[in-house]
Amino acid sequence: LNGLTGNNSEPFLDLWMGEEAKPEDFTRVYEEKEERIYTGACRHDLEHGCYVAGEDRGVFNVEDGTLLMGNLQAESYFAPNREQLKEWLKVKPEFDSYEYTRDNLCVLNLRGGEYASEPALFLRKKYWTDAMAQMKKIRSDMEFMIVTDDVTMAHKLLPGIPAYHFPVHGDYVTVKNARYLIISNSSFACFPAFTSETVQKVIAPKYWARHNVSNGYWASEQNIYTGFEYLGRDGKLYDAQACREELETYRGQNEFFAKHHEKPDGMAYRLGEIQAKAAYTAYFGGRAVRSLKRRLTGQQK
């Protein structure tokens, strides 16, 4: 996050970036440990592997003058400084807004754009409707609005729900100051939700970036955060501790996970290609059918 407004003119976060560091100031580089599994869930996971890594304890032992590289989203890296983070990531008063902070309003942070072309990644309509049903259990008069980078896709996926794409500071503060949040598997919402002073409930997709296809693995394990509730494909909610315990059991007992750490070749790779192609065909075929139905419905009106 660069903390800029929509026109990249002025930082909206009152964020001290530290003293300027020059290349010669770094005497070593530490790359956070990676872990990937290779599956036919999508072309990316077959070719490059799906990133599933959790925390790397080595991050806590780097020396001064080290350039730290990695995903670096694990809760353990920043949770001890949560209250300080709220100060470090404080929004300047002139950019802050509580216009959409209401006791009966839930904000959906929907990620579209390039996500929408990946069936393993783009969250299905069922995730959002199941999550909204959970929020309705809290208040029967709960209303919903969408904050998104892709208003067109939001209208197609969830017609009838108001959708907005504000300048980046507007999207950020709307998420940060919401009472109730349903977020996507995008890191954009993580820090505003994690540092929020107003939020009462956050629902996120179980298995994060592989909510649609996972048989128990997380993409990645770094995205399990205390205080978030994770919605499974079964429509049920799981707290962070339950997710961690389930993951530990999965890692210890699941043969699929143990056998997919190496990129496949030969027949195994070709079978993966067939699986991925079938997933894309079904996904885009379904989108085409739904688009045709919308057009026909519009003509009938």
Task: Give the predicted meaning of each segment.
Residues 1, 66, 104-106, 142-144, ...:
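Hydrophobic beta-strand segments of well-ordered beta-sheets in folded domains
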Residues 125, 134-222:
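Donor-binding and catalytic core of enzymes assembling or modifying cell-surface/extracellular glycoconjugates
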